[in-house]
Amino acid sequence: MKRLISTLLSVFTVIAAVQAQSRVEQLTIKSEILGAEKICSVYLPDGYDTSGESYPVLYLLHGAFGTHRSWWRTGGGELPRIAEEEIAAGRAPKMIVVMPDARGLAENKGGKNMGYFDVEGWPYETFFFQELIPYIDKKFRTIAAKDGRAIAGLSMGGGGSVVYAQRHSEVFNACYSTSGLLDHRYRYDDPARYGIEWLWSVAHNSPTEFVKNATPKELEKLRSVRWMMDCGDDDFLVDTNLRFFTEMNRAKVPVEFRIRDGVHDWKFWREALPEILRFSFKK
């Protein structure tokens, strides 16, 4: 009998451990604003189902031609493994991580309308703030306030996260850009010359120009957000990151900037992810 009880206890312990593990859910949101369905992945921390607690939310944006899976897939960001390591070590709090999909409409494969900004016929930024965030706050136990939200991203998503935090500083407490696509020197009036519409939308939504032209009131709002950025020393975007950092310093908006050994690849971004998780809700 003692052996049976011991065996049953072992089974129940394993079941409880499995139920308590972190997981990634894939959701489909029917957007009235976009007139389309959009996918997103959501990481839920260990114990979410049983704790009854509310959690802070990190919105984590993928890069150009990436997907909602980029940050959590093996060989990509490997978020579940890294998040569990950081949380277990006490370096980051338990959090929900939302990874939206910004691939546009054309069979959801990218290209046309890809990106995080409103363009004609595809108001993605409007969808993000008027539909996605409210949907997440309604479906999950979130801390639905500025102190409970952060945003981060890589490359195109890094630029998107910075612009979102600039325009919606009341929504996010922190912003982290890794290898951010923060500006372009292309001609703003001729997107066809480069054949890629999303680069044109980036050029028209420059975070560097935003800071340069910001009013004193807008600069004060920027100071209500904690800013951090990094880039590889051999990354082709390091110069534009330096320009943004210089402009933020000129405007006296505090920002941390790290240039590390690396290029524009997943090795660099995986190494950045622990710092993203630590920084997002640092006390």
What are these regions (language model features)?
Residues 21-283:
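Non-catalytic cap/lid and distal C-terminal segments of serine-dependent acyl enzymes
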Residues 6-16:
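Bacterial N-terminal signal peptides
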Residues 1-4:
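Positively charged n-region of N-terminal signal peptides that target proteins for export
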